[in-house]
């Protein structure tokens, strides 16, 4: 039961890593994880939240190894964009099976597969209650899906970018390696930069900072965490331009 009867946000951009879709597998998409995520998104829609989604592609394609072997970076990034489209198709299908209206929009034209991205159409769809999945990153090489999430969040005038990860917030050090690592509840953009805390790549992070777009990092693998974040309960780490109390 939530102690706060009203959601803390009205329109959000949810960023999911491709790796989150793998579950316990080492590659690809775990159907159980996909369906659970679709159900959690459905809960938000039923609360009246307008939901945009950006999914990474690391579960299907990682370009680093091929780049070291000599592959052109632009080619590798284009392959990565297509991986995000595949994940987007899977998420759209899972949402449809959960009886949630969803639209997949791609930053690169893929006629017959998904719609071309336009920000005016995306906002119109969100206002009508549809979940909008943004695929193919920004459509440009050398840009991460974190950058795409911040860019789309700013464009659709989301109130927050929710970054779903494998850990339940931002820590002073890697909690997997350092048991003494301390979790932060709130941080300012300046503190993250000063302490060199790993939240997302610098280009994405500074874009969010420059447009006063709050970032909330939480554990997407923790059942109910997404709903708690939306209801304004203590969950994850919020990063904003405001100084912590």
Curated annotation (Swiss-Prot):
* Annotated UMP binding sites: 57, 77, 138-145
> Would you say which domain of life the source belongs to?
Bacteria
Region (Involved in allosteric activation by GTP) location: 23-28
**Could you list the residue ranges that cross the membrane?**
none
Q: Which GO terms describe its cellular component?
A: cytosol
Regulation of its function: Allosterically activated by GTP. Inhibited by UTP.
For this UniProt entry, what is the primary localization, expressed as one broad class?
A: cytoplasm
The terms under GO molecular function for this entry are: ATP binding; UMP kinase activity
Where, by residue number, does ATP bind? 15-18, 58, 62, 165, 171, 174
Supply the alphabetized keyword list. Answer: Allosteric enzyme, ATP-binding, Cytoplasm, Kinase, Nucleotide-binding, Pyrimidine biosynthesis, Transferase
Q: Name one Pfam family in it.
A: AA_kinase
Task: Give me the reactions it catalyses.
Answer: UMP + ATP = UDP + ADP
Q: Where in the cell is it found?
A: Cytoplasm
Annotated pathway: Pyrimidine metabolism; CTP biosynthesis via de novo pathway; UDP from UMP (UMPK route): step 1/1
Task: List the InterPro entries.
Answer: AceGlu_kinase-like_sf (IPR036393), Asp/Glu/Uridylate_kinase (IPR001048), Uridylate_kinase (IPR011817), Uridylate_kinase_bac (IPR015963)
Q: What HAMAP family does UniProt report for this protein, alphabetically?
A: PyrH_B
Q: Its biological function?
A: Catalyzes the reversible phosphorylation of UMP to UDP.
Indicate the family of this protein. Answer: Belongs to the UMP kinase family.
Indicate what this protein is called per its UniProt record.
Uridylate kinase
Q: Which species is this record about?
A: Shewanella frigidimarina (strain NCIMB 400)
The lineage is: Bacteria, Pseudomonadati, Pseudomonadota, Gammaproteobacteria, Alteromonadales
């Amino acid at each position: 039961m939530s102690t706060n009867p009203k959601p803390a946000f009205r329109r959000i951009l949810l960023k999911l890593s491709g790796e989150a879709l793998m579950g316990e597998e080492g590659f690809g998409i775990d159907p159980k994880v996909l369906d659970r995520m679709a159900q959690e998104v459905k809960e938000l829609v039923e609360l009246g939240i307008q939901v945009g989604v950006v999914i990474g592609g690391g579960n299907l394609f990682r370009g680093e190894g091929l780049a070291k072997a000599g592959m052109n970076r632009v080619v590798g990034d284009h392959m990565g964009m297509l991986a995000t489209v595949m994940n987007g198709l899977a998420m759209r299908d899972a949402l449809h099976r959960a009886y949630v209206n969803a639209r997949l929009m791609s930053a690169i034209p893929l006629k017959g597969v998904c719609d071309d991205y336009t920000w005016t159409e995306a906002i119109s769809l969100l206002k009508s209650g549809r979940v909008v999945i943004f695929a193919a990153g920004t459509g440009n090489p050398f840009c991460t899906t974190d950058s795409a999430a911040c860019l789309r969040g700013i464009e659709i005038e989301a109130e927050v970018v929710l970054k779903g990860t494998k850990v339940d917030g931002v820590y002073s050090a890697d909690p997997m390696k350092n048991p003494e690592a301390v979790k932060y509840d709130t941080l300012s953009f300046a503190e993250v930069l000063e302490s060199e805390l790993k939240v997302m790549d610098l280009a994405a992070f500074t874009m969010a900072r420059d447009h006063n777009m709050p970032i909330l990092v939480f554990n997407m693998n923790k059942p109910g965490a997404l709903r708690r974040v939306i209801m304004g309960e203590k969950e994850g780490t919020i990063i904003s331009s405001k100084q912590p109390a």
